[in-house]
């Protein structure tokens, strides 16, 4: 059974792409066949896995507009054991082009169905905005949306806006849309603010917050510049252990036995 999770937040800088990359890496480490789809025109997930976004021949953009098959343009990294549908700057133009297409909100989901039986998990990294690209990511989230939330001021306000968006998409496009979980990121236990945000989010969404909390870490900032996930760059760091714990938590909730490879 393939599980499809979309990582989304309309607010940028919350650790969304960082989570997409590192959750994919640890799930692969734990024996899962993982496809990461970069749906963001900034292509940060693509470059963070060592792929030059300027040299991407065909990727998410071409798949969405129908000029390429998703099956033929997935890149596999044998070292990391992750498959990637890369993005490129050309995806920025899709916003205009997709408006004219029929069933434009379901283009990604239609493409994913061609390959979903090849993977245990498909993770989709959305852009930090409410756009037709993000809507495609939400409609494709057959098993839920993972929402990273930065442990900083106004976190709840941004989360409230996103839940309204999810509700609108659920009511108009995909009745099965649900929140898989809220992930608290960039936590600094030395500050009162960080601790207060954790308590506030947990009190407002008691059944949705993951037990794992991702700390603020220089290692998470360094790894993308080297084109590798934290599981390779600094697996024994607090951040590395935290993302490993998140992968274990999700796999356990999904009833998946873990086998490290």
Regions found by a protein language model. Name each.
Residues 1-261:
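P-loop NTP-binding core
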